[in-house]
Amino acid sequence: MIKLTDILLRERKVLSVFDFDDTLAKADAWIYVQQGGRTIKKLDPAQFAVYDPKPGESFDFRDFDRKLQNPKIIKQNVELLKKQLDKARRSARGARKVTILTARRIGQPVTSFLRSLGINAYVVPVGSSDPKVKADWIEKQILKGYDTVYFMDDSPKN
């Protein structure tokens, strides 16, 4: 039998998830809109977040597969990340997890940049701009027992 006091006294499992591009930092990177095998326009991440593709358009994310160019932190969000990482370090093992969940295919450029700031964070590259991919990853974490999830992302689609 499960007792109410057992439920109330157990430590909650908290997951804090941060997007990277245009949430924690802005860098010189473009998404190239392709049609018929050629680039017809380029979008920054903020423009891409609200862009509705036309039939026949596809995207080229090559700028997101290499070292960050001219990255600039978004200070208030990075400070929040640092606070969440500090809480995770001070909590019971496994009670708190902080993750950078990025649409990028390669996490290393993000990891390297964060380490240059003295931030050691777990980076998960999902390799897709489809919001469902991030949602599916978060759902898997909930199924692993996380009962409180905080999510920060610049894109309303996510």
Locations of regions flagged by a protein language model:
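Alpha-helical substrate-recognition element adjacent to the catalytic core
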Residues: 13-132
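Conserved Lys-Pro-Asp/Glu-containing loop-to-beta segment of HAD-superfamily phosphomonoesterases
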Residues: 14, 134-157
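Short acidic, low-complexity intrinsically disordered linear motifs used
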Residues: 1-10
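A short acidic-Thr-Gly-centered motif at the start of a beta-strand
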Residues: 9-11, 86-90, 138-144
